[in-house]
Amino acid sequence: MQTIITLPIKARARAHRFYLDALGLEPVGEPGKDGIPEPLQFKLGTGVSLMLIPRTGFGWVLGDQPAAKAGLSECLLQCSCDEDGEVDEIFERAEKAGATMVLRPEKKSWGYTGSFTDPDGHLWVVTNAEPW
């Protein structure tokens, strides 16, 4: 089974550039006329991808239901790293690529963690978690 996480976006080019630069994700598919794959997808892992759909078409995908307002979410998107330095590197790249810092990386009881929002307001958590 293929799992696809789908998020609404405001601008394809901006979202494409952010996920390339901030998280170093690998695009899926052949580039279209604008140089960006259509649909805009990134490989997250074996059998898992991230699809980014313009907000104007997102409601259609939902069966003509309105998409939540930007910045409202009941979902955390999380990256798990092997070292604290890797967390810091992702935060540096994300900030340069246009992320808004929510919580800069710091040591918590469960590990080294921080969070940011992408340019469309989706919340990402990056963690080097303590072993369970």
Give residue ranges: language-model regions.
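Short catalytic micro-motifs in class I SAM-dependent methyltransferases
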Residues: 4, 23, 125
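A residue-level signal for beta-strand positions that form part of recognition/binding surfaces
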Residues: 49, 74, 123
